[in-house]
């Protein structure tokens, strides 16, 4: 018996069912402070990892900058060869300067031509992009300003000379004179009196005579 009671005591108790809150308490539950879940990584470890990532990124940037400087130096060394000025006279130095100026002018012309081609390509790309947007119907709408205009002015702007004809709605209506309505009222009279007059023997006699 003792062993059975000890086994029952060792068994874990079932977790209680979660309490379902009412909809009226949702707002209070959302605003009340809750115990935040503790992350598996401590704050000091997070700071250490951030510092390490920043150091790695800094090293990568420095390495890329060094590679760009090396490529620039290699390109300049291949294109701009060192000048041999030892033992040159005044006339030879003048000729060398003329040659260098001619090379500079040629490079400037090539640079201008390349820039013109790039500008032309950019404009062509922009035109083609605009044509694509026009074909798709996705054009940029201009900004419209609010303008106060009456209905008459709007119809005048849309229809022109036909606006007056369309706005004159009473022209197509049938005009009824007041005298005609009074005459009809006199002829009809009170319908109750007509029914009373035609009811009974006298009414039948009147119908027979008519």
UniProtKB/Swiss-Prot annotation:
Domain of life (superkingdom): Eukaryota
SUPFAM superfamilies in the record: Troponin coil-coiled subunits
Region named Involved in binding TNC: 32-79
In-chain residues carrying the UniProt-annotated modification N-acetylalanine: 2
Record InterPro entries: Troponin, Troponin-I_N, Troponin_I, Troponin_sf
GO BP, sorted A to Z: cardiac muscle contraction; heart contraction; heart development; intracellular calcium ion homeostasis; muscle filament sliding; negative regulation of ATP-dependent activity; regulation of cardiac muscle contraction by calcium ion signaling; regulation of smooth muscle contraction
Self-association state and partner proteins as the record states: Binds to actin and tropomyosin. Interacts with TRIM63. Interacts with STK4/MST1.
Annotated protein name in UniProt: Troponin I, cardiac muscle
Phylogenetic placement of the source organism: Eukaryota, Metazoa, Chordata, Craniata, Vertebrata
């Amino acid at each position: 018996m003792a062993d059975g009671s000890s086994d029952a005591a060792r068994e874990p108790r079932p977790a209680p069912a979660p309490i379902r809150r009412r909809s009226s308490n949702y707002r209070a539950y959302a605003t009340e402070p809750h115990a935040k879940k503790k992350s598996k990584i401590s704050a000091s470890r997070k700071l250490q990892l951030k510092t390490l990532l920043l150091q790695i990124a800094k090293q990568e940037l420095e390495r890329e900058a060094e590679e760009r400087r090396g490529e620039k130096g290699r390109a300049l060394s291949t294109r701009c060869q060192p000048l041999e000025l030892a033992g040159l006279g005044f006339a030879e130095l003048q000729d060398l300067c003329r040659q260098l100026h001619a090379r500079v002018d040629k490079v400037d012309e090539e640079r201008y031509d390349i820039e013109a081609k790039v500008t032309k390509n950019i404009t062509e790309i922009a035109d083609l992009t605009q044509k694509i947007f026009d074909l798709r119907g996705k054009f940029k709408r201009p900004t419209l300003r609010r303008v106060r205009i009456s209905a008459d002015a709007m119809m005048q702007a849309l229809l022109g000379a036909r606006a007056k004809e369309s706005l004159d709605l009473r022209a197509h209506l049938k005009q009824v004179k007041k005298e005609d309505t009074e005459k009809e009222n006199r002829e009809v009279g009170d319908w109750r009196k007509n029914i009373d007059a035609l009811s009974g023997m006298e009414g039948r006699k009147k119908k027979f005579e008519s």
